A protein has these predicted regions:
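Extracellular/periplasmic carbohydrate-active domains that bind, remodel
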Residues: 1-258
Length: 258
């Protein structure tokens, strides 16, 4: 099922392999299941589209379960107002949630006002470190990603990968330039129970292309809330160390609260 260059679309109750939305506006996808097993089997991609709602969907896919990209696949422009809620994701390969990779380097595109809430992530399995992350924002192609909210997300003991991956990067395999920035991202009521998570990464690119204004509220890992004032944290530790997050260069303002 493909929604292409369309407006005011409602899709409900279908089972398919993939359900991409490109160059479209005002789209609702409700109670749809996307299940794939072949290469490049992304579930529910969004390309250069605005005002898209996924509600009550299920994705088990052989590539990213759901993505938000700017210019890609013949669709042009940024993305605004994309919401996924009340849904379940199972990624046999790559990311459950992935934002930001593709865009038009000449247009400095923006992806903003993205919300993911009340979601269960059942699995994540990716051997390539560059493509790990249950909740992943990788800004490339001069894209700016901002105003993103992850809320009430429950992550089970996935097979292989990272919990969080926020990076401004220049992946020459897929991008023509690094991204411009990632900013104003909230992780609220995120729960992970398991022991397979590898080291998460939060890394900027340079002083002009930063990751900044990142907030974790009630991040709970194996029953322990990770906060700046948590009991048992040595004074010389970064709070991110307690979550097994690597915070690298060109990152500004990360807060962990109860």
């Amino acid at each position: 099922i493909s929604i292409i260059n369309s407006r005011n679309i409602y899709v409900e109750g279908l089972i398919t392999t993939q359900c991409p939305t490109g160059g479209s506006d005002s789209v609702t996808i409700r109670n749809v299941k996307a299940i794939s097993s072949y290469g490049w089997g992304d579930g529910m991609n969004v390309f250069a589209s605005n005002n898209v709602l996924f509600d009550g969907v299920f994705c088990r896919n052989s590539d990213d379960c759901t993505t938000v990209y700017a210019t890609r696949m013949g669709f042009h422009g940024g993305c605004r107002n994309v919401t996924m809620q009340n849904s379940t994701l199972w990624a046999d390969v790559a990311h459950p949630i992935f934002i930001g990779l593709h865009g038009d380097v000449e247009r400095n595109e923006v992806m903003e006002n993205l919300t993911y809430r009340n979601i269960d992530i059942l699995d994540h399995r990716e051997m390539q470190v560059d493509y790990q992350g249950c909740l992943a924002i990788n800004a490339g192609d001069n894209n700016l990603v901002r105003n993103v909210r992850f809320e009430n997300i429950r992550i089970e003991n996935f097979r292989q990968g990272q919990l969080v991956n926020l990076r401004i990067f220049y992946n020459k395999k897929y991008c023509k330039a690094p991204g411009r920035g990632i900013e104003n991202v909230l992780f609220k009521d995120i729960t992970y129970n398991g022991d397979h998570a590898e080291l998460s990464h939060i890394v900027g690119y340079d002083k002009e292309r930063m990751v900044k204004n990142i907030r974790f509220e009630n991040l709970k890992i194996n029953g322990k809330v990770i906060s700046d004032d948590m009991a048992g944290k040595p004074a010389w530790y970064k709070t991110s160390d307690m979550a097994r997050f690597f915070v690298g260069e060109h990152v500004g303002s990360i807060v962990f609260t109860k």
